[in-house]
Structure formats: structure tokens, C-alpha cells
Amino acid sequence: MFFNFLIPPNSFSSFPEYVAFVVSLSYALNATLLLLYSRIFGVEVKEKAFIPVTLSFVAIDFTSIQGLRLFVGIPAYLGVVILTSLCILEGLALALTSSLALVNASRRHLAATWIAANVASSGLFMAFVGVS
């Protein structure tokens, strides 16, 4: 999720504190979203797979964020296209990964849910940070 861009690195006394905070926040948010999905749609969670899957979400988040950082300073119209593409790609990756921790979950429904969550967080990103 692109919420990590909303946290300014200069608000921490050291870079390791910043990284620890962002990783913790990323894990907590993604784990909460996965549990919320399972409660709302009545899908059983595989307890043994939950922690490894949610930890992999952090890696997926940071891969997406690093991809987004490559495009800082591009024109706004192109930035929106790239941001939308990253939302879709990350949503598909998160859906595939989260299906490993859920019993009988629809991958299509998971993909739509994660893409919607990414679009919402990207809207926040564009509202607070913007695209140049």
C-alpha cells in the first residue's frame, strides 16, 4: 500500500527507527485487512500460513513503493497511469499471496478487494503527496 509515502522520514531521529515503524505499520495494516476480509466474507484463515503470508505482504508493499519512487517527477497524466497500473499489479500479487492463507477464498474476489484497497490508498497518496 502506498500509505508509506505519507510518513515523512525526517520525523524520526534515525533511519532504522523509520524503517522499523514503516515495516510495523505495513504488517499491522495488511494483517488487519486480511482478518477483516475473512470476517466480512466468512472465510476461514489457515493459522499456520497467516504469519508468513502477512510478512510477505510487507515485501510486496516495499517492492511497489520502490517501483513508484522510480517515477517521481514525471508528468501528472503519466503518473496517474503508472500509479493505477501499480495498484492493479500489487492487488493481483496480494490476492495471490493472501489466497494461500485463506480456505476456499475466491481469487477473483480477493483481487478485486485488494485492488480497491490499493486504489483507495493511492487516492490518499495523490491527495496528500500528489503527482508532479
Curated annotation (Swiss-Prot):
It is found in: Cell membrane. One of its GO terms (cellular component) is plasma membrane. The chain crosses the membrane at residues 15-37, 49-71, 81-103, 110-129. It comes from the Archaea. It is a multi-pass membrane protein. Its main location: membrane. Keywords: Cell membrane, Membrane, Transmembrane, Transmembrane helix. This is Uncharacterized protein AF_2164. It comes from Archaeoglobus fulgidus (strain ATCC 49558 / DSM 4304 / JCM 9628 / NBRC 100126 / VC-16).
